[in-house]
């Protein structure tokens, strides 16, 4: 918090009605917080770092570990230094791309480990968007696993830190109101929720309480299940509703 206070002016925007918004439970600012993987829930949260004139220096999709967030914010400060230099905007845009792509190799092994895509998001990309996704690192491995109904290795997918910088590099020094958030945040399922406020003393989700929890956003992947009826949810129905395999 001190890092943010000392280096940035922070604000939030409600994206509930935006076309790129995903879906999750409603979590108040005083609610519980839990750990998850970098880049989880990209449709629900986007962390923008802007120059005071509104130009996008960096954008991070979804949740980020605090240590890794500071790494990326430090990087954004260097991108801002580039933006503030004299010279043609075209030359600076080329450097923007180079900086974002080069920073991928500067990520620590621990950060990369924290940036593996959620398993249900990997399956969504492989089964629903195989021919269009940019999230797969080894297409042959994915296609072979799908054809043989085998396990898709985690290494067949790009980590979210790579996806982030590659997508940022496609929009160099774009004004905030022109940034294509739809394209940037579009990977995995649109619903992501860890039910932070419904964890019991054992660290497990209270399924009965979570079932009736208020939700916000639009679940574009939703299918009709017993969750749409008045029948009690089974354990499998609950997991399916929350995108958990």
Segments from the language model and where they lie:
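Non-globular targeting/processing and membrane-anchoring segments
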Residues: 68-245
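Thioredoxin-like thiol-disulfide oxidoreductase module
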Residues: 1-58, 74-76, 151, 155-173, ...
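A short acidic/small-residue loop/turn micro-motif
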Residues: 63-65
């Amino acid at each position: 918090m001190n890092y943010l206070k000392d280096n940035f002016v922070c604000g939030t925007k409600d994206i509930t009605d935006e076309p790129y918004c995903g879906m999750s439970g409603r979590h108040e600012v005083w609610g519980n917080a839990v750990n998850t993987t970098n880049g989880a829930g990209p449709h629900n949260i986007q962390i923008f770092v802007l120059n005071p004139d509104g130009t996008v220096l960096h954008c991070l999709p979804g949740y980020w570990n605090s240590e890794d967030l500071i790494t990326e914010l430090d990087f954004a400060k260097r991108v801002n230094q580039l933006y503030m230099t004299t010279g043609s905007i075209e030359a600076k845009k080329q450097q923007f791309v180079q900086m974002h792509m080069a920073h991928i190799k500067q990520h620590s092994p621990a950060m990369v480990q924290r940036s593996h895509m959620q398993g249900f998001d990997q399956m969504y990309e492989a089964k629903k968007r195989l021919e269009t996704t940019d999230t797969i690192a080894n297409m042959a491995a994915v296609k072979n696993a799908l054809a043989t109904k085998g396990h898709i290795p985690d290494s067949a997918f790009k980590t979210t830190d790579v996806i982030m910088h590659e997508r940022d590099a496609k929009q160099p020094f774009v004004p905030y109101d022109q940034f294509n958030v739809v394209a940037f945040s579009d990977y995995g399922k649109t619903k992501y929720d860890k039910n932070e406020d419904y964890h019991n003393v054992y660290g497990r989700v209270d399924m009965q309480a979570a079932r009736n929890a208020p939700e916000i956003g639009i679940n574009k992947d939703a299918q009709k299940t017993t969750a749409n009826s008045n029948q009690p949810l089974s354990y499998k129905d609950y997991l399916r509703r929350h995108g958990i395999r």
